[in-house]
Design a protein with these regions (language model features):
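NAD(P)-binding Rossmann-fold cofactor-contacting core
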Residues: 161-178
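Rossmann-like adenosine-cofactor binding region
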Residues: 173-267
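Rossmann-like dinucleotide-binding domain for NAD(H)/NADP(H)
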Residues: 90, 223, 229-319
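Glycine-rich Rossmann-fold phosphate-binding loop(s) that bind the pyrophosphate
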Residues: 148-149
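An N-terminal-biased, well-structured beta-alpha scaffold segment characteristic
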Residues: 1-89, 213
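Hydrophobic Val/Ile/Leu positions in short beta-strands of Rossmann-like dinucleotide-binding domains
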Residues: 7, 143-145
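N-terminal Rossmann-fold NAD(P) dinucleotide-binding loop
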Residues: 152-153
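Phosphate-binding beta-alpha-beta segment of Rossmann-like dinucleotide-binding domains, i.e.
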Residues: 88, 93-142, 157, 161, ...
Length: 319
């Protein structure tokens, strides 16, 4: 039986090696150099690397690749045009980290609302505070949620448990929505001033690049908080620094920045109303690789049967 050469990162090896079907010939890599050497043999590939440029180089070298799998939900660092030209199927990690990222958003909102960072700093100084530095309740506050994929849906679900009034931005109003808590892409900017929280959970695409700029920040409430767990590219960072420095908006909770890692001399670090969490939201759990491995193994079964693998990325839309 001719086997299907499958090239995989060594990081996933302990979770899949003894569970792979017999029609798979696995080849694992531990470095960029090994990946580049193995890539031309791959019919199926899982090439995830921290350095997106290295990963793109390996993908480019995989000239016979039919299916590329990734643990990452965002695929903005991949050569999507090349994959589309080659007819390669791409599955991503959509939903793998949705639970922990949704929890991170709630944590960020509570951190800002209750002034928790100031509480921690007081503890470090061994100072007993006589009043709370934060006096905002989530109850009854209004949140605008841009991005309604797997992560967005879980954010909405969790915020509703806190009685937050959530409005989601979707391409079209669902027929059963009843209307008021759904906005379309051409409507949300005009209503930015209505919201206490503006939460970004959109994919990084040309359409979302710089979607929050000086005009959008100026339209927000002066008491509002911007939360970004999407990509740094969706926010004009210079405009955000200016808005935070002048207190045009109250604060920002930023899991993502431009660039990453954020240089030590970047002005964001020195702003007391900027909360920077170093793109840790998706890593704040220990099930990422387990879930990804299980999904990959299930998809191998579908692939062998000629069925659709999931979740498949639209290589034109970029998500």
């Amino acid at each position: 039986m001719t086997k299907t050469v499958t090239v995989l990162s060594g990081l996933i090896r302990p979770l899949v090696e003894n569970r792979l079907p017999d029609w798979i010939e696995p080849k694992f890599f531990a470095s960029k150099e090994e990946a580049l050497e193995l890539a031309p043999q791959a019919e199926i590939g899982w090439f995830d690397m921290y350095d997106k440029k290295d990963m793109a180089a390996v993908i480019s070298a995989a000239t016979g690749l039919k299916w590329l799998n990734s643990i990452y939900a965002g695929v903005d660092g991949m050569p999507l045009d090349l994959l589309r030209e080659r007819g390669t199927v791409l599955t991503n990690g959509a939903g793998i980290n949705a639970i922990t990222i949704a929890e991170y958003v709630v944590m960020g909102m509570l951190t800002v609302a209750k002034g928790y960072r100031d509480v921690v700093r007081a503890q470090e100084r061994r100072e007993w505070l006589i009043d709370s530095p934060g006096k905002v309740e989530l109850f009854g506050s209004k949140a605008l949620l841009l991005g309604y994929g797997a992560i967005g849906k879980l954010i909405e679900e969790r915020l509703k448990a806190f009685a937050v009034d959530v409005t989601v931005v979707r391409r079209s109003r669902p027929r059963d929505s009843g209307g008021p808590n759904t906005l379309t892409p051409d409507q949300w900017r005009a209503q930015l001033g209505d919201f206490d929280w503006v939460i970004l959970a959109v994919p990084a695409t040309p359409e979302t690049d710089g979607m929050i700029g000086a005009a959008e920040l100026a339209a927000m409430k002066p008491t509002a908080t911007l939360i970004n767990i999407a990509r740094g590219s969706v926010v004009d960072q210079d405009a955000l620094v200016a808005a935070l420095d002048s207190r045009q908006i109250a604060s920002a909770f930023l899991d993502v920045t431009t660039p990453e890692p954020l240089p030590s001399d970047d002005p964001l670090w020195s702003l007391d109303n900027a909360h920077i969490t170093m793109h840790l939201s998706g890593r704040a759990q220990d099930k990422m690789f387990v879930r990804s491995a299980q999904r990959f193994l299930e998809n191998l079964g579908r692939w062998k049967k000629g069925e659709a693998v999931e979740p498949r990325v639209d290589l034109t839309l970029g998500y």
